[in-house]
Amino acid sequence: IIGITGTGGACKSSLTDEIVRRFLLDFSNKSVAIISVDPSRRKTGGALLGDTIRMNSINNERVFMRSMATRQTNASISKDITDAVEILKAAEYDLIIVETSGIGQSGTEIIDIADVSMYIMTPEFGAATQLEKIDMLDYADIVAINKFDKRGAQDALRDVKKQYQRNHNFWDKNPDTMPVFGSIAAQFNDPGTNELYLHLIKIIADKCKLNWKSTLSLRIGNAEKIYIIPPNRTRYLSDITKTNRDYDIWVNEQANIANNLYAIDRLKRLVGENELPNIDNKKLMLHPECQQILE
């Protein structure tokens, strides 16, 4: 049983979908059951139950998904979740995923029913001291920093790895080896999500004593956003329009200088050259190409 929890808006459902998609490709003879919990509103008592909108990989005969409401406020899972999990166990699903609703800093209910727990967060958690308040960093087997394309994501990854090391007293290990991964669930074949999945399968195999081993050939590494227009060219069209505007301004300035020179030259013919001031300085203001055109 994998318990997936995290802050609201961290795209837990999207990341769950990416994990399910890879699992179905990796293990062609195994089945998956997903229970997705949505919060009930205190005012109306209703729940959206809209996590299936994010799931693109569940249209498969090996996948079962059910959305549930918490039926109570200030709770991340339903009181009936234990019975639901027992039913899925009886149905002999190979992998059961329980996704909670969004939690705060103190929500840890998922660890009571899950064999492996995953905490999903975003880089926008505030100051590094806020990490001290997140209970799930004490219990999570694996941590995903989703939306890794956000500004400051690399700093967030470093801070969370150090916090995980402190919380678990892994002082003899390098912080870079902590099970904390950056991911971009909205990006196809994201290398960070690939690495997260491979590590998750390894944790499941170790903790549950299963002979599961991934055979997928996946590109791994830090999550990197794939841009349609490279960041160093994002102002490319703007630069073109600015160049055109600057050229138009320059042309108008040169045209005014040429008009003035023409007027002075005509006046010189009428009243005589000795009656006019020296216009050589005025000619110097005209671009050589423009002088050549006039000549």
Roles of regions detected by a PLM:
Residues 1-8, 64-69, 143-148, 181-183:
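Short glycine-rich or small-residue beta-strand-to-loop segments that form or flank ligand, phosphate
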